[in-house]
From Swiss-Prot:
Any single biological process term in GO: anaerobic glycerol catabolic process
Location(s) in or outside the cell: Cell inner membrane
Organism: Escherichia coli (strain K12)
UniProt keyword list: Cell inner membrane, Cell membrane, Membrane, Transmembrane, Transmembrane helix, Transport
Ranges of the Cytoplasmic topological domain: 47-111, 155-159, 211-245, 291-347, 399-411
One Pfam family named in its UniProt record: DcuC
A GO CC annotation given for this chain: plasma membrane
TM region(s), chain numbering: 26-46, 112-132, 134-154, 160-180, 190-210, 246-266, 270-290, 348-368, 378-398, 412-432
Periplasmic side: 1-25, 133, 181-189, 267-269, 369-377, 433-455
InterPro entries in the cross-refs: C4_dicarb_anaerob_car (IPR004669), C4_dicarb_anaerob_car-like (IPR018385)
Family: Belongs to the DcuC/DcuD transporter (TC 2.A.61) family.
Role, per record: May have a role in the transport of dicarboxylates from the periplasm across the inner membrane. Seems not to be essential for growth. It is likely to be a cryptic gene, as no or low expression has been found under a number of growth conditions and when tested with a large number of potential substrates.
Entry-linked PANTHER family: ANAEROBIC C4-DICARBOXYLATE TRANSPORTER DCUC-RELATED (PTHR42002:SF2)
Gene: dcuD
Protein name as it appears in the record: Putative cryptic C4-dicarboxylate transporter DcuD
Amino acid sequence: MFGIIISVIVLITMGYLILKNYKPQVVLAAAGIFLMMCGVWLGFGGVLDPTKSSGYLIVDIYNEILRMLSNRIAGLGLSIMAVGGYARYMERIGASRAMVSLLSRPLKLIRSPYIILSATYVIGQIMAQFITSASGLGMLLMVTLFPTLVSLGVSRLSAVAVIATTMSIEWGILETNSIFAAQVAGMKIATYFFHYQLPVASCVIISVAISHFFVQRAFDKKDKNINHEQAEQKALDNVPPLYYAILPVMPLILMLGSLFLAHVGLMQSELHLVVVMLLSLTVTMFVEFFRKHNLRETMDDVQAFFDGMGTQFANVVTLVVAGEIFAKGLTTIGTVDAVIRGAEHSGLGGIGVMIIMALVIAICAIVMGSGNAPFMSFASLIPNIAAGLHVPAVVMIMPMHFATTLARAVSPITAVVVVTSGIAGVSPFAVVKRTAIPMAVGFVVNMIATITLFY
């Protein structure tokens, strides 16, 4: 009991510090180290196996951190960095803008304002598989589709509400949290995406698109001061040829191709994600060179790939490791075992625990305005909890993953809401009033689809 009390105090302190914009990596790591020390001092057990212990607590703790860093950087971390590097490279050469320009063209042919509003959400979610920055995608859509939506009679608030939620489901083989979730669930990213994410995400996306249609139309009818003025139509700057739109999709094409070849026996196994990213990078370099005929500029642009890798290490990989340190602290002090025992005797079962954890992580995402910190803080705990409840880890980790990204779109302080609201000149608090119902619908469908399909 004393260990649980300490854990609760630490959790409250962590939440306060993160809300005050302290770096979550440092907060999580410090909390984990403190809990490991308390766990040993209170006699719950050691940090390392007795046969591997150095005899010094602080040395054992940092040896454990070294193990985590070594495992994550060489495996999951490298995949995340390669994906982040490729996304940065696509942004540098304009391929992301080409894809947005191409996919947004059919929408401009639709004249029904609320149908195009719902279609914008669906198209945005498709783009989200390849443009993995929510605020980046939001800004691109504000330039290309926001003026069209407003000119058709949709209010600015409705248009922003839909655009701000276009990455409310983070899915696909290029999305860093998906890669992390697959690793935690103990499976390859291709299996996680095609067998688990795709069916559930499809249900959620369709339900959210339909709810946007009715919710935004109802809000616009209710709002007596709705403004139908024309928004200035702007063109995307420096858009390369439209065939560049295939480049962000190339990793998915290569992954699908390798899965097919492995299935028919022409390859021993599907390509590793890092190999897919490097092959895509190589092909893109040749495309760039043959288009520009400038070897120096082509090679200089590749630096964006390595810059992106560094950014992912600093922002994401370190957060993953910090989350693991925190999870190790909770395990050492006995909190995880206590949660498992409590869940087993509560009668809630796997479904009840899954829903409660998804709600907790969703609330954290709304309060923090971020999905990464709460998800990566709790995700590492899931395998042990799931095993104790005799539930596959993926069945618990996936709804939590989707819950945190859905909830993020209801936070007035999350980056994509702030950025899109600022461009449109509307209040982020007014925007999240319009995103709350569609995201709540998505949350419920996420739970129902997961339970129905996989439990």
